[in-house]
A protein has these predicted regions:
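Conserved G1/Walker A P-loop phosphate-binding module
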Residues: 2-112, 319, 328, 383
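C-terminal-of-GTPase-core extension/linker across diverse P-loop GTPases
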Residues: 31-36, 42, 54, 233-295
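AAA+ P-loop NTPase catalytic core and its hallmark functional loops
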Residues: 109-120, 191, 241
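Short acidic, S/G/P-rich loop/turn micro-motifs used as interaction or catalytic elements
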Residues: 110-112, 147-152, 186-189
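Inter-motif core of Ras-like GTPase G domains
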Residues: 115-150, 157, 162-174
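Canonical P-loop GTPase G-domain recognition
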Residues: 176-177, 185-265
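Membrane-inserting effector segments that mediate pore formation, membrane fusion
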Residues: 286-324, 328-379
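Hydrophobic alpha-helical transmembrane segments of membrane transport and translocation systems
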Residues: 382-414
């Protein structure tokens, strides 16, 4: 991903430097400057520091590791070993498409009775994984267990999982989160209800029973509550196209994973998900962060001289939402959106200069801008950007949302 960063990323970096410089030169209090600087650096990590999520997947042979990778992408990225353990030595693999990638720590199947088709370098699966963990720290550990096997011989696997968690902390001082995943719930009884969303009462009862069992076992071993998500990842492909799709709860898993990941790993996974609800949730979380900054700046009336801080942050927010949507992040798409809101800025102007020009047309611009209006403008822009980039609505529809949200905020001010 880093190699693909071009001029737009340089402009975004310049924009963030411009914002931070304006913060330092502003008449804001020292306390506020420190808080605002921390928020801005956090926001910067979403775009400038964006990288693939690093996910370690642990589970026995046949637990569905490769199927899960394919289900996340909606493409056949990992080979599935039907009879022998397909996974070789524990090492990092980058699975990617045009939207981005995920780094997967590919573990040998725990408890396997056959050698993997990719010959492992050492005999102990957990030792192989430890070698890779030394190289890169996983963002999250996924513990996969088949629905039919949650009560069968997984205690040893759980102890190895705990050891891995402890090793990660010892190596990286990182308390890695664990997510339990019950796989292949479509195969639970009754077999007659094998299609999502599995509404049969007995099916749901069996699914929830497996979740409770795995929750109990994981919590007992790692001594802290662990979220467990039941899924079905079964998909059939022909010539690269999906011809049968039995995926269930993959969107729920992705939504939860994003909340557990570091900021720099969230945007690319949201892009890859292609799930609008996931993309919107992350976009709104980012918008809330920007609103917090604009509200803090406007705790007292904001001098026009300090306004480029607010408008600069709003531009960075728009660019981040565009990136989350899966659109190629470029200056043109940001400028087209700004133009759609009725704000005319020269197309050849650098983003940092755009933030200066936006001050002239900012809602309510006078000698001072109140914090509530600044936050309202940020909120209105974020909702319009979500409509435009994620929902793929027209410029007219996005502008209507922007004006409606802004009018409601103005009415509250009166």
């Amino acid at each position: 991903m880093t190699n693909n960063k071009g001029s737009i990323y340089r402009q975004m970096e310049e924009l963030f430097r411009f914002i931070l410089t304006n913060v330092e030169q502003s008449k804001l209090s020292t306390k506020n400057k420190v808080q605002i600087r921390e928020e801005i650096i956090g926001l910067q990590s979403f775009v400038i520091g964006a990288r693939p999520a690093r996910i370690a997947i642990v589970g026995r042979r046949g637990a569905g590791k490769s199927s899960l990778i394919n289900a996340i992408f909606g493409e056949q990225k990992a080979e599935i070993g039907d009879y022998k353990s397909q996974t070789g030595s524990g090492k990092w693999y980058l699975f990617e498409n045009e939207l981005g990638g995920i780094e997967i720590l590919d573990t040998r199947g725990l408890g396997e009775s056959h050698l993997p088709e990719e010959q492992a370098a050492t005999a102990n699966p957990i030792e192989e994984v430890k070698q890779s963990v030394k190289q890169k720290c996983p963002d999250v550990l996924l513990f996969l267990c088949k629905g039919k096997e949650v009560g069968a011989r997984i205690d040893e696997d759980l102890q190895q999982l705990l050891q891995l968690k402890q090793d990660i902390y010892a190596m990286h001082a990182y308390n890695v989160p664990i997510v339990g995943i019950v796989t292949q719930v479509d195969e639970l009884a009754p077999a007659s209800n094998s299609e999502p969303p599995f509404t049969h009462p007995k099916k749901q009862e069996n699914i929830q029973a497996t979740v409770r069992i795995l929750e109990g076992k994981l919590t007992e071993v790692v001594t802290t509550p662990v979220t467990v998500i039941p899924i079905s990842a079964y998909v059939e492909y022909d010539l690269g196209e999906i011809i049968y799709d039995r995926r269930w709860n993959i969107d729920l898993l992705l939504d939860y994973l994003i909340t557990e990941l570091p900021k720099e790993a969230q945007v690319i996974l949201a892009k890859l998900s292609k799930v609008k609800s996931v993309q919107k949730k992350l976009s709104r979380n980012i918008a809330k962060s920007v609103m917090a900054v604009t509200g803090l700046i406007g705790a007292t009336p904001v001098p026009i001289a300090d306004m480029p801080i607010i408008t600069g942050l709003q531009i960075s927010m728009i660019g981040t939402i565009a990136m989350i949507s899966g659109d190629k992040l470029n200056r043109k798409s940001i400028m087209q959106f700004i133009g759609a809101m009725g704000i005319n800025v020269g197309m050849g102007v650098a983003l940092r200069e755009v933030s200066r020009q936006l001050v002239k047309v900012f809602p309510g611009a006078g000698n001072f801008i109140s914090g509530s209006i600044a936050s309202a403008g940020t909120y209105a822009l974020s909702e319009a950007a979500i409509i435009y980039f994620i929902d793929k609505k027209s410029q007219a529809e996005a502008k209507k949302v922007y004006l409606d949200k802004l009018d409601k905020a103005r009415n509250k001010e009166q």
